[in-house]
């Protein structure tokens, strides 16, 4: 490998949410990575820093071309230049769109278990969360859409918006073209706009590709807003740089108005520089990162398999089969129906910090989410602590 992902990083003193909240525990919870970002990004930011003047920034065409080139070359999708709008983050954009595209007390559909901040973006704006729970096949370790339930909820006249997580967080599943097409047609039929959060799209396992929602049909393209960013992929969450892609001009104008009204459409001094460097020079680093993360996920699976082989069937756990993200979703239903209690136990006894699943809705209370985006040494130590904690949990 050209890049040393095994090199331990010390994030103490950097005001890291992930590490400061954990104290002396090993944090494998919030979704950021413990790797330094790609060298071309650091070099571009260093040049910008050395300039020494940090006034207001514009959004140049170079930024749009960086996004267009990346999605064309990596995902085979062509974005129109005018369809791209800068925003300071995917969640600020989603919250803004919930306000702009719906009215108070209308329903916003989400497929649970799903990224917990979706709930905040809906409830904090006075809209109703309408869960369309995914069905779970425990034997296969996979989720699927309950089409009858989803259509019933989309058909409710009070339902005007759906937030899709593609690829899915926390399960790591990649939605296939057929699934996305069917979902898009239902939303079109029932006049429900789709926000597709695709922030994890570049973090697929080697050999797997995600399918952009807007690419599967004209209805999906014209009835959706796609949220994208370099932040998850290149570990830039603290730089507040993202984009929304909106092909339909009428919908685009509404989204643009909302983002500007909410003052989340102006870049800071480093946002453009980092994004352009990521999407024009970050490919080789990302390919090695994906391979490294796949190795980390194999290490987690091996530890789970070893644990399962050493305990009674009644105490075994199951990893959901995911092909994207660095997050793993662990089914602990044989041990508890309250993984908040399990996570408290792991934190107190093993000094290991994981995410309890109840916050993701649906059947999440039976699961914990594991962040494997750290050095292999820490992954191995985390799995040692996890399996020891599972054995002692009662």
Set out the residue ranges of the language-model regions.
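N-terminal small-domain helix-loop-helix segment of the aminotransferase-like
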Residues: 2-89, 96, 278-281, 393-394
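Conserved core of the PLP fold type I
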Residues: 54-185, 202-203, 210-215, 219, ...
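A non-catalytic, amphipathic alpha-helix used as a structural packing/dimerization or gating element
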Residues: 51, 62, 66, 250, ...
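Conserved core segment of the aminotransferase class I/II
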Residues: 218, 222-294, 390
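Conserved glycine-rich beta-strand-loop-beta hairpin in the small C-terminal domain of fold type I
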Residues: 276, 292-301, 319-332, 364
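PLP-dependent enzyme catalytic core of the Aspartate aminotransferase-like
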Residues: 220, 336, 345-354, 360-394
